[in-house]
Amino acid sequence: MLYLNVEQLERCIQTLSASLSLYQAAEEGSTEQEVFRNAVVKGFELTQETAFKLLKKALKAFGHGARKLETTPIKDLLRMAAVHGLMTLDEVERWFAYRDNRNNTAHDYGEGFAHETLRLMPAFLEDVRHLAGVLKHRLGQDAGE
């Protein structure tokens, strides 16, 4: 049986949450706040990439081939996750929005995209924590106990 280690994802979530708290506590418009905003945007990207790597590993446990998964678009991976009960369809739709935002911020670090990313943070943190919990429960070292 394949076991997933979600510790790296949990660490990314912790770091992203801390960056968001520091951003919110910083003086409005300060350089410090801008630094924390940038940390939130990068943390958002890293947390997503870590989650998608884990999803690929999880989908292998459901019989999907590694080579095929490596070439499968992210949105299709998310749909597959729903088919296997790792996410709900509503969660998949929200993850589509997170992915679209991440793709936009990767090409344009403008303030508008950063503010959109910040707006998504509360829901994203809730969804990624839930995903980590599902993966840990279903495929983690303690799964099935």
Language-model features and meaning:
Residues M1-E145:
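Solvent-exposed interaction patches of small proteins and small membrane subunits
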